[in-house]
Design a protein with these regions (language model features):
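Hydrophobic pocket/interface hotspot
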Residues: 4, 16, 24, 76, ...
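Short, well-ordered alpha-helical segments enriched in acidic and aromatic residues
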Residues: 11-27
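Short beta-strand segments enriched in hydrophobic/aromatic residues
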Residues: 20, 80-82, 106-107
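Surface-exposed, charged secondary-structure patches
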Residues: 25-31, 35-86
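Short beta-strand edge/turn micro-motifs at domain boundaries
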Residues: 86-113
Length: 113
């Protein structure tokens, strides 16, 4: 999870590719409509924006819930502050060939920072 938090703070795209599986899908509700982004679209959006680090934001994050279902499946609920908001995610993780990957991300802005 440290790498996940670092990716979102620094937007290190090499690290991004080591955290998010290439088949990962991102889900969120924007203006009342479901927003679905496959890996490539999410990667492009992250690469194009200014990072919280470059904006002088400090890292503020915590893991609210971790539930490992099996040797190959887990769910994590992190909360972090970035871009003036408090974000919560549900991350679906799968262990593939001994490495944990984020394979699904459901996100929501739950407040202001």
């Amino acid at each position: 999870m440290e790498d996940y938090f670092e990716v979102l703070h620094s937007q290190d795209m090499e690290l991004f590719d080591q955290v998010f599986h290439s088949e990962c899908v991102l889900y969120g509700v924007v203006d009342g409509a479901l927003n679905v982004r496959p890996f490539a679209a999410y990667r492009e959006a992250v690469a194009a924006r200014q990072s919280p680090h470059s904006l002088g934001e400090k890292r503020r994050e915590e893991i609210l819930l971790f539930d490992q279902i099996s040797d190959t499946a887990a769910m994590v609920k992190p909360q972090l502050q970035m871009f003036g908001g408090v974000m919560q995610d549900y991350l679906g993780l799968s262990c593939i060939d001994g490495k944990w990957w984020i394979v699904a991300k459901l996100w929501e802005r739950v407040g202001d920072a």
